Amino acid sequence: MPKEGITPRAQDYSQWYLDIVQQADLADYAEVVKGCIVFKPTGYAIWEAIQRGLDDRIKATGHVNAYFPLLIPKSFLMKEAEHVEGFAPEVAEVTRAGGEDLAEPYVIRPTSETIIGYFYSKWVRSYRDLPLLINQWANVMRWEMRTRPFLRTTEFLWQEGHTVHATEEDAERETLLILHEVYADFVEKEMAIPVIKGLKSEKEKFPGALRSYCIEAMMQDGRALQAGTSHNLGQNFARAFDITYTDQQNTIQYAWTTSWGVSTRLIGALIMTHSDDEGLVIPPRLAPTQVVVVPIYRNDAERSVVMEAVQRMTAEWKGRLRFKIDDRDNLTPGFKFNEWELKGVPIRVEIGPKDIEKGSVAIARRDQPGREGKSFVPQDGLTDRLTALLEEIQQALYRRALTFREDHTADVATYDELKQQVERGFARCYWAGTTEDEKRIQEETRATIRCIPLDQPQQAGRCVYTGKETTQQVIFARAY
């Protein structure tokens, strides 16, 4: 039975999502600033956990962090034709400052290829300066017309990596390294979200890129969510901003650049992949609080005994588990159970006088609401048991999400089958169509090519739209 204040998924999935965001206390609407949200402490704590996991991987692959200006001269954006065309409708401009009109307007960073390209043109001189591998954590502004918390907001938080290389091969290697070893690895292992790694179609690729790679995840309504992108920019931005280097033969060459990023959309992906009608569900590796202890007592004498037992029990958890003790006296145990379930804490431990006598505690798993997920276990060896259970929950969430995706993905051979399948999930099909064909399909079905999977079949088949023979398969789906 769904929680009060949460619309059941089957009734209205979109409203269910908004209810989770508010009821789990993740964010608030910033009504006075169009399309923006306030990250409340729980929501921001999840973002901090995402930052830590990604930052470790980014640094482990040889990158360092820096920070570049928020304001970008408008003329910079105009230097790369495809880029400006792709972002022009979303750009916010600053035209006055200090009470005067500016000689040249600034745009508020929609992405940083242009401003970073300007500085890279100053920093790169020789092949000895390459590769240049820099990441920044920043906020971004894109003037979105239709917003939704975490998924699409006017201002959002993200990381964006920008690198410079001597050859196209090096740039391509970098692009795929980030895709596989940073993004896919993090999202699957830490967030327990299975992803499809693939190449974007010409229609869907990043404005100004040579090639765009992505990871795509399926949400519980069958729609796709682009969880991360990695772009080989070729020499487009290097030529626009004169990023050149002198090679070993003392010849001046244009460099090859990449950019890649993930954002707070990942919080939206987490909510829509794992949560249920009872509230938020957070994978243990990412959970700010992994275990909550709810002491149960009826009077001051029992409280003293129970709290002493709780302190002994949790003493060895420090440094091993992220936990909270809910010792609020003005709330009933039932209210606390409900609240922590709503907030998605992976494990709840209950302990009262009778449990102390028996040398046991009650454990409730968030991924299995109700009696199914509740058990009584000895206090002896509890720390190891909880650690193992957290990992079991992590793997169970991944398997459940993977099973859901597999159950809602189908191979389709005809356009009619495609139209039916995108109503419920991913349509995998052979594709030899044009960008114009893809646009027509989007107009008719609201589905796009989410990616051209890197894992391709060996045998040929017929294009779902044109009937031409091809060996290329794609994933069509509706998307966030």
Swiss-Prot record:
**What EC number(s) does its UniProt record assign?**
6.1.1.15
Example GO biological process: prolyl-tRNA aminoacylation
Main location class: cytoplasm
Q: Which reaction does it catalyse?
A: tRNA(Pro) + L-proline + ATP = L-prolyl-tRNA(Pro) + AMP + diphosphate
The alphabetized UniProt keywords are:
Aminoacyl-tRNA synthetase, ATP-binding, Cytoplasm, Ligase, Nucleotide-binding, Protein biosynthesis
Q: Where in the cell is it found?
A: Cytoplasm
Q: Does the keyword Ligase apply?
A: yes
Record's Gene3D superfamilies? Anticodon-binding domain, Bira Bifunctional Protein, Domain 2, C-terminal domain of ProRS
Gene Ontology terms, cellular component aspect? aminoacyl-tRNA synthetase multienzyme complex; cytoplasm
- Class of enzymatic activity (EC top level): ligase
Molecular function per GO:
ATP binding; proline-tRNA ligase activity
Query: Pfam families, alphabetically?
Result: HGTP_anticodon (PF03129), ProRS-C_1 (PF09180), tRNA-synt_2b (PF00587)
Q: Which domain of life is it from?
A: Bacteria
Q: What does this protein do?
A: Catalyzes the attachment of proline to tRNA(Pro) in a two-step reaction: proline is first activated by ATP to form Pro-AMP and then transferred to the acceptor end of tRNA(Pro).
- UniProt domain comment: Consists of three domains: the N-terminal catalytic domain, the anticodon-binding domain and the C-terminal extension.
Please report which protein family the annotation says this sequence is part of.
Answer: Belongs to the class-II aminoacyl-tRNA synthetase family. ProS type 3 subfamily.
Subunit info here reads: Homodimer.
Q: What is this protein called?
A: Proline--tRNA ligase
Q: Which organism is it from?
A: Roseiflexus sp. (strain RS-1)
